[in-house]
Amino acid sequence: MYFHYKKQKDLSIFGLIFKNQLQDKKSIMKLLVCISQTPDTTTKIKFSDDNTAFDKNGVQFIMNPYDEWYALVRALELKEQQGGSVTILHVGPQANETVIRKGLAIGADDAVRVDAEPQNAMFTAAQIAAYAKSENFDIVFMGKETIDYNGSEVAAMTAEMLDAPFVSYATKLDVSGDTATLERDIEGCLLYTSDAADE
């Protein structure tokens, strides 16, 4: 089940998944940013008495910094340069709405919450892929990893499910017409440039 959120009128390092062909300039570019909720790094984590799970009581949660400062901010910059719309997608329960509303306050046009508890990376990727496919987004932005699990799995899994080109650890993105050119760090601090539309 999807829950949609709209931005209030009185309220701007990532992974990228591309459609095989970007919309031409006459079309509105549709950008999707996937966000997750993570414990604040300043929060003291406690575990249950049997040490099988962490105790969420008293834990301050925030939007994953890689999703906020890299994926969302870069999507908003691209929207400002090229036009289009930015939609936030979050997989999680209603209790996580705070991070969604923060994303809208930062500048996203609208947001969608998949009403499901993330079980693992594959489950989360399947939820993202299903929604992204149904709405035909041009580019999907994700932070390189979450600061709690550091898995770096969801973006690649989502791209595979969408059968779409994927670039991890991107550091720069330029879009011109129906072509996206980007750079990413590789071993030795060299930069790799890729024409995503042709991959």
Model-flagged regions — what are they?
Residues 135-146:
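Short beta-strand-loop elements within alpha/beta enzyme cores
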Residues 173, 179-191:
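Anionic-ligand binding region
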Residues 149-166:
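Short Gly/Thr/Asp-enriched flexible loops that form oxyanion-binding sites at enzyme active sites
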Residues 120-132:
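Glycine/small-residue-rich loop that forms an oxyanion/phosphate-binding "nest" at active or ligand-binding sites
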Residues 29-88:
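N-terminal beta-strand-loop-alpha-helix module at the start
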Residues 192-199:
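Conserved small/polar residues in nucleotide/adenosyl-binding loops
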Residues 99-123:
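A glycine-rich helix N-cap at a beta->alpha junction
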